[in-house]
Amino acid sequence: MYETNELALNFALKSHPGRIRPLNEDAVGADPGIGLFILADGLGGYNAGEVASTMTVSMLLTDLGAQLARANGGVDTFDPTDALRNALVAMNSAIFRAALNSAAYEGMATTVVIAWFLGGRLWVAHAGDSRLYRLRDGQLEQITRDHSFSQELVDAGMVSAEEARVLPAKNLVTKALGATPDLEPEVHDYDVQPGDVVLMCSDGLTEMVSHLEIGGLITGCGYDVVESARRLIDLANEAGGRDNTSVILVRVAAPESQSDSTVEQAQADPDLAAQEEIPVLQLRDPVVH
């Protein structure tokens, strides 16, 4: 458990390559000391997707932490919206330039979703179809809106949300880091209540597991973030595991509550019989997997 800016956070991070793909192009990371959590999904079909996602998580943790440090931790005067926008614009340019300068990285890009618990509020930034949900009072709500072709069709009333799930172009994103030279970041902030659970995930989860199943599993686990993270990954793999699957779960707890926090990165394992357990983290420093 970490306490940051009046919030006590219990969290778990887990990533798995799935049953089909030998390479995990997802990346997850956190700086729990400042309440910062980041998930990225290197876009399938592009070169060096794993480079783009890992680069994104690592550099954003460093950049955002440095921006907050320069403000001397002055949460009251620090503007997280500007910090997130500036960091994402710089990250987009860095990936785009790297792709231009190396044939090995040509066309690489990544989605990203960021949750930053700061000053008693939650700031959310994203690009692409990696999502952030909030579970409050037993109700799971999708907070982010996918930047995708299928979502645009849903918004236009041309297809239903269920029909969009089976479209041939369902994985075509309309915004991603490194895909174009310019990026208009999407950043919003939300209130936070004790007991809230925030779920961040790559599309490897949402393509395999329904909205109702996700909410039911977390509540069925008694809002235990570590157990929920493990079981969500297992559920995606049991449903076929066609893509890499990553989840970050953060529960806002009372300051005096006690809970472990963990990061797990499983290796490719079709029968799910063996998963590598990563020890409980008790560090303030950023962690990337």
Protein language model regions, located:
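PP2C/PPM-type serine/threonine phosphatase catalytic domain
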Residues: 1-289
